[in-house]
């Protein structure tokens, strides 16, 4: 497929000043990556898409001015996102370069046009390849690489006057700079600045860049060096994970209402299924009351027909470290967790299977996050021990109120995860799978929804 997107203009947004300086121990305007940052260096950038539509959208030039001026104001507070991932000399550490020369380059801001109508843009939900063209490109195969890039795309059937009908804002952020929570904190602040002129609205917590709590761990330096030897043995070149072939993928998005989620939790809970503990081999103490939204929805996804099945997911560690990291920490602070079950526990597809899947997720979180960094020297060993054909990888942004992202012209009609790090991935509840697997997954997934109010 050829490109459906034409670049109209590309510029750089620069912050006039920095209002949130780096920690005192960060010399030379550089933030040394922690072991948790280094772990994500080979990953493709995180990419998010926000679809806005309606007659209330401002003319495209006015919309661009609002986004650019508010981005500049936000970068003054989120300084590392204006910098670059780079190699420091002579230590050969990978750092976020926030020096004046790096930050002064600004964040690349692309204005683009989609070769189709507003209605065409609405129908892109199942087209992974088209989605990839709506977000800016960040190539992570060699350092330095910018931390952030932005693209704003309009359909071709609009002009610069009046309401434009639809627009898509795409954001790409290098995963080595921060995790999903870091990205969403930035996007929330940017939207607040667009609405009110400043990201520092009531309730705003300035981002924290200090990685000392993580870097002080006795195994931190050795593990970080191990990650670097594997992911970047010939700095500044990077062994980036290859992009999955989007032409082989199918994409689906499913909407679960709040009522359906409540009903799902009630179905899973043994207290609402009196015979579950005795009839399905699930002790009453095994499944928490109630399961979290994440565990409940994950149980819908995680059904398999392998001898052993694994669910891989990242879990936030900020509140679980000792001392804890603040919620506003701008960096990576997640751990890859593994839930395990057998074919017999998952394959019946009934309420019992859902309960066992939810229980396994909750138990994995309890065990593996009690001391998040205690087994850090075994993470690679554990990951390599999981058979690649026996796991489902899942991610979630449900805690981040994505549909509250209002830049001043209302909430988005759709928010999508455009980056997929592996060939098959589930983002609650947008699904990317091999095309041959999608129909079977969809039939099973929808059958599990039967009976939800």
Per-range role (PLM):
Residues 37-39, 147-154, 423-428:
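Short, surface-exposed beta-strand/loop micro-motifs that present aromatic residues
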